[in-house]
């Protein structure tokens, strides 16, 4: 997200349910190695979510709701403001579904906030925070249903950046911090003679870092980046 790695340390990969459309202004897909900008895990490519911002003065509020089969509900409310050099984005969402089988429910709460300030015509500051919590249940295979296969996961991220834009050159220095709290019950299969689990898997992870890059364009279809 905005060039910052998002994998959960204990799993070594992102938790996809922690990312919602309320974050995204656009999604960039880069093919091939990109470790200079995105770190050592970007050996094969990168999917980068660029967060929302307001590009012109004014106030905009967007409400999205949807309802479908299996009691599926999607909701999202976003307010964006830009006044002079100041801008802000505040979003909240709630999503849920019963799933197409028993013990397959999913419920998610999410919130995102961002503020920005253009110090000059070429330099700006921004800070943001995103927190998501979801509850999910896994019913196991149809032939051997699983009970109590539940998980409760909370993940968050925050960052602060100083950015510059001079036409032919642009860059940023950013600081980021990600965290997650995971509570997982592996469940049990009654048809296999199993009983309820005596313990739960619980983990907490966090990751922080600094990212810097500067890009320059000297002629058409060319870009040189250091970072």
Listing of model-derived features with the role each one plays in the protein:
Residues 27-29, 47-49, 162:
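N-terminal secretion/transport leader regions
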Residues 97-104, 108, 124-207:
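Flexible loop and strand-edge segments within Gram-negative outer membrane beta-barrel domains
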């Amino acid at each position: 997200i905005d060039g910052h790695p998002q994998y959960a340390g204990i799993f070594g990969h992102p938790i996809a349910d922690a990312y919602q459309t309320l974050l995204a202004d656009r999604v960039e897909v880069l093919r091939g190695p990109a470790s200079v900008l995105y770190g050592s895990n970007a050996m094969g490519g990168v999917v980068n979510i660029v967060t929302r911002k307001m590009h012109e003065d004014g106030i905009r509020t967007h409400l999205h709701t949807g309802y479908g089969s299996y009691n599926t509900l999607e909701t999202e409310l976003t307010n964006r403001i830009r006044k002079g050099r100041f801008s802000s984005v505040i979003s909240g969402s709630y999503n849920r579904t019963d799933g197409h089988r028993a013990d397959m429910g999913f419920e998610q709460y999410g919130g995102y906030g961002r503020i920005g300030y253009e110090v000059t015509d070429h330099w700006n500051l921004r800070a943001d925070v995103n927190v998501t919590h979801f509850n999910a249940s896994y019913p196991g295979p149809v032939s051997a249903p699983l009970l109590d296969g539940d998980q409760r996961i909370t993940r968050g991220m925050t960052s602060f950046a100083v950015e510059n834009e001079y036409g032919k050159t642009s860059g940023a220095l950013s600081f980021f911090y990600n965290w997650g709290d995971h509570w997982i019950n592996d469940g049990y299969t009654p048809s296999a003679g199993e009983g309820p689990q005596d313990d739960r898997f619980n983990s907490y992870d966090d990751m922080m870092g600094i990212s810097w890059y500067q890009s320059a364009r000297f002629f058409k279809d060319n870009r040189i980046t250091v970072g």
